[in-house]
A protein has these predicted regions:
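Secretory targeting signals
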Residues: 51-95, 119-189, 203, 208, ...
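Aromatic- and glycine-rich beta-strand/loop motifs that create alpha-glucan
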Residues: 19-44
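Terminal transmembrane helical anchor/hairpin motif
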Residues: 63-66, 182, 187, 192-268
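Helix-loop-helix units of permease transmembrane domains in multi-pass membrane transporters
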Residues: 95-127, 269
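Short cytosolic juxtamembrane segments of multi-pass membrane proteins
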Residues: 270-274
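Helix-capping/transition residues at the boundaries of transmembrane alpha-helices
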Residues: 36, 97, 108-110, 176, ...
Length: 274
């Protein structure tokens, strides 16, 4: 092998070494973030509230004489969605704020660590917490549905619905983290809640595209995430299959939105003076 080939192999090896080193730093920050959040009360409070929302559906079903199982089912999915999104907003909006208040970010950035890696580590730690939260609530919901339907009630469309709700919470957590890079934790929560509310009303925004403010609503429809893509509605209860390309498109759209939120957060924190 000539010298050019040897030099090329050496560059590739160094690239892998640097990439592995960066990944280890990101995973270390993610692990610390995960363990920090596990010690917080907000995680268990939201988890308890989510479990209560799932249980409320059982009591609400006794108020309906037509398809009480449907009441339990929709209460359960709504409770899981709201609980995961609430946890993503509350934790994502406060992750960076605590670092600025405690001045721990200054100590971290004194080390050979990129701010982008710091953001990624924080987000991946939050993803770990959201995954654990989602898994526990999903198990609780499946247990309740098995009791209500007197047997196993798990289908492919039901699993797809759970996964899409999980992706929705990841998007919201990413944008909550982005908002926290340039404002306070309280305002980040407010912005994230408004972001979530508007992102679930795209079908209603079409009716507002009239008059002089038509351009404004069109811009909002383009900029805001389409959270409606992650809600399958009554199709899940009646087990109506979704086209595979639609589900795959929703998954790719979720990764695109997460990438956009992290890119925006990285751009802001790189330009910020500490």
């Amino acid at each position: 092998m000539d010298s050019f080939g040897l030099d090329w192999l050496e560059k590739v090896r160094r690239g892998f070494d640097h990439g592995g080193e960066r990944m280890l730093k990101i995973l270390a920050i993610a692990q610390v973030t995960f363990l920090e959040i596990l010690r917080e009360k907000v995680l268990y409070n939201v988890l308890l509230c989510g479990a209560c929302l799932l249980s409320v559906g059982v009591f609400a079903s006794h108020l309906s004489f037509i398809q009480p199982q449907r009441v339990v089912f929709h209460f359960g999915l709504s409770g899981l969605s709201l609980s995961c999104c609430a946890l993503g907003v509350l934790l994502g909006a406060s992750l960076l704020g605590r670092e600025w208040e405690r001045k721990t970010a200054h100590l971290v950035f004194c080390r050979p660590l990129s701010r982008v890696h710091f953001i990624l580590g924080k987000y991946f730690g939050l993803v770990g917490i959201l995954s654990l939260h989602w898994f526990l609530l999903a198990l609780t919901l499946m247990g309740i549905l098995n009791l209500v339907f007197h047997g196993p009630w798990i289908s492919g469309i039901f699993f797809q619905a759970l996964c899409l709700l999980y992706l929705e919470s990841l998007i919201l957590a990413g944008f909550a983290l982005f908002f926290s890079t340039f404002t306070t934790s309280a305002l980040s929560v407010i912005f994230s809640v408004g972001f979530y509310a508007l992102g679930n009303t795209h079908s209603q925004l079409r009716f507002l595209e009239q008059g002089g403010t038509q351009w404004l609503w069109k811009v909002l429809r383009v900029v805001l995430p389409h959270f409606e893509y992650f809600h399958l509605g009554t199709r899940v209860f009646y087990q109506l299959p979704m086209p595979s390309f639609w589900v795959l498109g929703s998954v790719l759209y979720a990764f695109l939105m997460v990438g956009c939120s992290l890119s925006l957060a990285s751009a802001v924190i790189l330009s910020r003076e500490l």
